[in-house]
């Protein structure tokens, strides 16, 4: 796992703190902030599948059980699994199918991680959502935790919706359009803003 702070992190924190009192307070509250990545694009995407539409705590528990069933959480191993191999892990049948399809894409070369470094955010998202089960939210989680891109604002994320509603809208959860408009104030550091808003809901460091 890469636990080194992204090169842009300190500047982003300084800019956000100067512009937004809510984020200034959160950044000061969590000075140990590290946006870590797992260093393995397949595992990062697989974790994002597991975490779709459930809490971080639940996702961590399911991932631990899933990893325990695999000799190695790698494309060649996961591609050979069937639903029976994963009974009791807490994964839905659909998520099992998605994980196997993702593994096949890596295993046969239809996904080539080397190309992502030269692609902008929207190009990476477009490539990823061509994979079965990967929607925009999953692709955005990969941009944040896999590529550690600085300006990702996942408007479909439940935690981000809750935090923005709590801090900026008097407890009212915003619509996707409202959240999209709100995010413009945090550009070009929306990943960092997202990460601290997540921390406000769960003081444990968010990882995928």
Write out the residue ranges for each language-model feature:
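Alpha-helical ds-nucleic-acid-binding substructure associated with the helix-hairpin-helix region
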Residues: 22, 54-55, 59-132, 187
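Alpha-helix C-capping/helix-to-loop hinge sites
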Residues: 33, 48, 52-53, 69, ...
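Structural motif
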Residues: 35-43, 90-94, 183-190
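A general alpha-helix detector
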Residues: 44-49, 65, 81-85, 123-127, ...
């Amino acid at each position: 796992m890469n636990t080194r702070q992204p090169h842009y992190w300190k500047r982003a924190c300084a800019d956000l703190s100067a512009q937004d009192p809510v984020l200034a307070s959160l950044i000061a509250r969590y000075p140990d902030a590290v946006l870590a990545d797992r260093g393995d694009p397949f595992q990062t995407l697989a974790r994002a599948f597991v975490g779709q539409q459930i809490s971080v705590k639940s996702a961590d528990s399911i991932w631990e059980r899933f990893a325990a069933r695999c000799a190695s959480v790698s494309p060649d191993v996961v591609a050979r699994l069937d639903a029976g191999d994963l009974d009791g892990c807490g994964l839905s049948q659909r998520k099992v199918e998605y994980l196997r399809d993702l593994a096949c894409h890596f295993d046969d070369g239809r996904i080539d991680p080397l190309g992502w470094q030269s692609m902008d955010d929207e190009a990476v998202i477009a490539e990823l959502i061509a994979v079965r089960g990967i929607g925009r939210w999953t692709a955005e989680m990969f941009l944040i935790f896999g590529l550690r891109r600085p300006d990702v604002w996942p408007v479909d994320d439940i935690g981000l919706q809750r935090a923005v509603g709590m801090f900026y809208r008097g407890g009212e959860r915003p619509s996707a359009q409202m959240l999209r408009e709100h995010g413009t104030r945090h550009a070009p550091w929306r990943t960092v803003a997202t990460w601290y808003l997540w921390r406000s809901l769960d003081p444990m460091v968010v990882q995928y």
